[in-house]
From Swiss-Prot:
One of its GO terms (biological process) is L-phenylalanine catabolic process. The gene is hmgA. GO terms for cellular component: cytoplasm. It catalyses: homogentisate + O2 = 4-maleylacetoacetate + H(+). Its EC number is 1.13.11.5. This is Homogentisate 1,2-dioxygenase. Hexamer; dimer of trimers.
Amino acid sequence: MLGKAEKRSEALAAEALAYMPGFGNDFETESLPGALPQGQNSPQKCNYGLYAEQLSGSPFTAPRGTNERSWLYRIRPSVRHTGRFAKIDYPHWKTAPHIAEHALALGQLRWNPLPEPTGELNFLQGIRTMTTAGDVLTQVGMAAHAYVFNADMVDDYFFNADGELLIVPEMGALQVFTELGKMDVAPSEICLVPRGTMFKVARLGEEKAWRGYICENYGAKFTLPDRGPIGANCLANPRDFKTPVAAFEDKETPCRVQVKWCGSFHTVEIGHSPLDVVAWHGNYAPYKYDLKTFSPVGAILFDHPDPSIFTVLTAPSGEEGTANVDFVLFPPRWLVAEHTFRPPWYHRNIMSEFMGLIHGRYDAKEEGFVPGGMSLHNMMLAHGPDTSGFEKATNGELKPVKLDNTMAFMFETRFPQQLTRFAAELETLQDDYIDCWAGLRKRFNGTPEGDWS
């Protein structure tokens, strides 16, 4: 006999979800025939008795290339999904500016995965902020979160007015049901929920816990990076991004809407589901992306290029070439460079780097960086291959090698990432991380050959 949780998981998994390909397209979709008006946005009376409503992700007068809005045709207008809010608290979800009081000194930091929950937690309850950067009130910067949970958001719904959420599952697949449709998101995939978009999260599959990472982007929205001399192809190709088709709930049962606004949390009880959009059209919408479709480029003769070539998505700042936050992927790839130290080189950086590992092993760290783990290398703090990685790359035969079984990523921002107290006191913090470089001995002996013994 299947238990209630197993039946739920099987029912969700049996859904064959449909998607529309493309990045930033002007989409149109309806879940009932004739629900989408033709030739206009706001008819005097919408079919099916629906309400027309615009969701704006940019100012009305933003340039055409960055102007984002969608028209939604819904069972009730969003004013009916609100009421008299009451303040609530998610004590582990922090927002910039947030300078925490803790005893941990400055340094390069690394953590093992979050421990599994001891009680029942849904997606929202399982979010733990590791770092914050910038200022949500001026809409710049980001926060890096980890999550771990083991229960569905059944009648709980949420939207974030502070920024868009880039969700990176590491263990356990998710069904993310948004106002504009459903997305199934497995490890090695990502999804993005735009600022202000209502959603809930359910579990797919059988795991003890569902775990992953979130980048909360307070600033300009994520977009595809310019390819420059690379040309029209490779990296993340627009056709591989998938936006969900319209889907809705028409249920009248006690539900709870929760909102994050300027770092504070609020809740209101309503008597129906707010996921009631029957049809929509526009370019402000959620999407998912399979990281395995990322087409990397790299050095094919010598040297190691800058990690910016691995940028999947970038959220620009007001300064050209300087990101508010980048989402960078280190995927499987061939290493073929001649007379070259092939791993990422030793580095001090104006940008601040938060890293995670989805599966496998990261080529610059032979040991200690595990799936579900995290590392933080803040601005101008030195980092690079550990001793074992250096020895292997320095003495190994330089034949073509496929770097396989790896999927690491980075949230990189122009702002220093401030550690939360939770992160500073987390039991999985590796006290010995700094020792991974202790074996890098002096090889200079005054001769051109050096001491490579």
